[in-house]
């Protein structure tokens, strides 16, 4: 004889409900383990034009490209008004070699981008003369869209104190 167990509809409904609840709770636990503090929220913010000096000392094309990207985006997000905003990059590190005229072919894409940003008044580029000389360059060896300043650190301080530029690294 075959032993068949029969459950009431009420018992089956309770079992199904418990299984569903257990599945939902388990899924919630898994999600909480992946994001135990929830997800970030976006704060919609409108930015006014800014005065900013970037202290640039990088040694790779990727890092220099990132600096140009950030400065360009800052200009865009703050209104890109050359009369109310000012973004100045002060170069005094390994990136100096990218701006040497003798390296134009090697870094053509980067230089075209930098020159375009200067030409369109998105930003200005200044280079430390002392650092350039340390790399073996004089002003005549550097691309014409770059302005040479006697000392990068002194220029950064001057821009902060005299022209109220915020400091960015």
Predicted feature descriptions by range:
Residues 34-86:
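N-terminal secretory signal peptides
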Residues 6-20:
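Bacterial N-terminal signal peptides that target proteins for export
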Residues 28-34:
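Bacterial Sec-dependent signal peptides at the C-terminal "C-region" and cleavage site
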Residues 59, 92-95, 130:
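Solvent-exposed coil/turn segments that connect beta secondary-structure elements
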Residues 100-169:
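A cross-taxonomic marker for long C-terminal extensions/tails that follow the last structured domain
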Residues 85-99:
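Acidic helix-start/capping segments at beta-turn-to-alpha-helix junctions
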Residues 52-55, 88-91, 124-127:
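Structural recognition of the beta-strand scaffold that forms the well-ordered cores
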Residues 18-28:
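Bacterial N-terminal signal peptides
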